[in-house]
Regions:
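Short, conserved catalytic or adaptor-binding loops enriched in Gly and charged residues
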Residues: 87-91
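A common structural junction motif
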Residues: 82-84
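Short S/T/G/P-rich N-terminal loop/turn motif that feeds into the first structured element of a domain
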Residues: 1-60, 67-79, 92-110
Length: 110
């Protein structure tokens, strides 16, 4: 059984990005991994989870966690990020937004 914990630590940001592919899942995942490697080296990056729709193999969601909004914005406005964003735009359409976690739960938490 899981238990709810309190709000997320102050300042953390969650970036949610949905993708609809115009290419194969394999090609998309390769491009995504290159982008993720770049972001993993940026200050404030905490982690990500890329998930694929169970029934629609061309539909993905990326959920990335950042220490704060400023770190996220600094990373995605770097000139070195541009080729990564362009590569993903060339093979998919996407929609994205920044969120702040309000509640979470994990197994065994009290």
């Amino acid at each position: 059984m899981s238990a709810e914990s309190g709000p997320a630590p102050s300042g953390q940001a969650t970036f949610v990005n949905t993708f609809t592919l115009r290419t194969t899942p394999e090609e998309f995942e390769e491009a995504f991994v290159r982008t993720a490697r770049f972001l993993q080296g940026q200050p404030g990056f905490l982690g990500y989870s890329l998930v694929r729709h169970l029934e629609e193999s061309r539909s993905y969601v990326n959920i990335a966690r950042w220490a704060d909004v400023a770190s996220f914005r600094a990373a995605v406005t770097r000139a070195e990020f541009r080729p990564h964003a362009e590569a993903l735009r060339a093979i998919s359409t996407s929609s994205s937004a920044l969120y702040t976690e309000r509640r979470s739960a994990t197994v065994g938490e009290r």
